Regions:
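Short, low-complexity N-terminal intrinsically disordered segments enriched in polar/charged residues
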Residues: 1-26, 30, 132-133
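Short beta-strand segments enriched in hydrophobic/aromatic residues
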Residues: 28-29, 88-90, 105, 121
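A short hydrophobic beta-strand element
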Residues: 78-88
Length: 133
């Protein structure tokens, strides 16, 4: 039996918590679309696994640790669609500053790959904390 969409996303979040950024792009379909309505300075859309790979590679040098907490994944009537609610415990490693941010993500996952996601993150708070590093 194929792995559920919820199980795939839980594994993905585990990698984030382990700072294994280089592996994350492998969870996306080649033509995946990621929408980030709260991205700044303007909403963002990232298209394709390789564009995501480049984006994640840029995270590796940041003094930032994200630990997913209180993860709840809601399955829907469509087995490919899940809604994930969770907090990140954010640590700025250079200053020791810690705080939590809320996140909601709507994902379509099939054949073990993320096809699309709409990510609602508090990027402003994280960006502000990184600017104080």
């Amino acid at each position: 039996m194929a792995e559920t969409a919820a199980a795939v996303y839980r594994r993905f979040l585990d990698l984030i918590g382990q700072d294994r950024w280089a592996e994350l792009a492998d969870y996306y379909a080649e033509d995946a679309v990621v929408e980030q309505p709260y991205a700044r300075p303007e909403p963002g859309v990232i298209v394709g696994r390789e564009a995501l790979r480049e984006r994640f590679a840029g995270r590796e040098g940041l003094p930032l640790r994200l630990t997913p907490q209180d993860v709840v994944i809601h399955e829907t009537t469509d087995p490919e669609v899940v809604v994930a609610e969770f907090d990140y415990e954010v640590t700025i490693t250079t200053t020791g500053e810690r705080f939590r941010t809320a996140n909601v993500i709507v994902l379509r996952i099939s054949d073990g790959l993320i096809r699309s996601s709409r990510d609602f993150h508090d990027v402003g708070r994280i960006t502000e904390a990184l600017s104080r590093r």
